[in-house]
Amino acid sequence: MANHFRTDRVGMEIKREVNEILQKKVRDPRVQGVTITDVQMVGDLSTAKVYYTIMSNLASDNQKAQTGLEKATGTIKRELGRKLTLYKIPDLVFEKDQSIEYGNKIDQMLRALDQKD
């Protein structure tokens, strides 16, 4: 059970630090509008699945952001190594967060039902 708390704490710390690194250290214009929404850690802390969102809904912008994040992974890991006191910095896997789009779709459906009444 204590290991679960550790993975949650490490995930929260990585989320905070990656957001800061993206804002201050990464100069790639493809990742300027990226916000980290969640980080899920594997139990042994070897891999961190980093969920992100961007303001644009264009598929080309999504692909550019994904490519920019993949290119910046080395810089992000290096900065995490400087800021975190972990034995091994986890491998970062970036995935677009679909939950916000899903929530917006549900919200639109509820509004449409509300307008019918």
From Swiss-Prot:
Keywords: Cytoplasm, Ribosome biogenesis. Its main location: cytoplasm. GO terms for cellular component: cytosol. It is found in: Cytoplasm. Signal peptide: none annotated. One of its GO terms (biological process) is maturation of SSU-rRNA. GO terms for molecular function: ribosomal small subunit binding. Gene3D superfamilies: 3.30.300.20. The keyword Heme does not apply. InterPro entries: KH_dom-like_a/b, RbfA, RbfA_dom_sf, Ribosome-bd_factorA_CS. HAMAP family: RbfA (MF_00003). Monomer. Binds 30S ribosomal subunits, but not 50S ribosomal subunits or 70S ribosomes. One of several proteins that assist in the late maturation steps of the functional core of the 30S ribosomal subunit. Associates with free 30S ribosomal subunits (but not with 30S subunits that are part of 70S ribosomes or polysomes). Required for efficient processing of 16S rRNA. May interact with the 5'-terminal helix region of 16S rRNA. Belongs to the RbfA family. This is Ribosome-binding factor A. It comes from Streptococcus suis (strain 05ZYH33). The gene is rbfA.
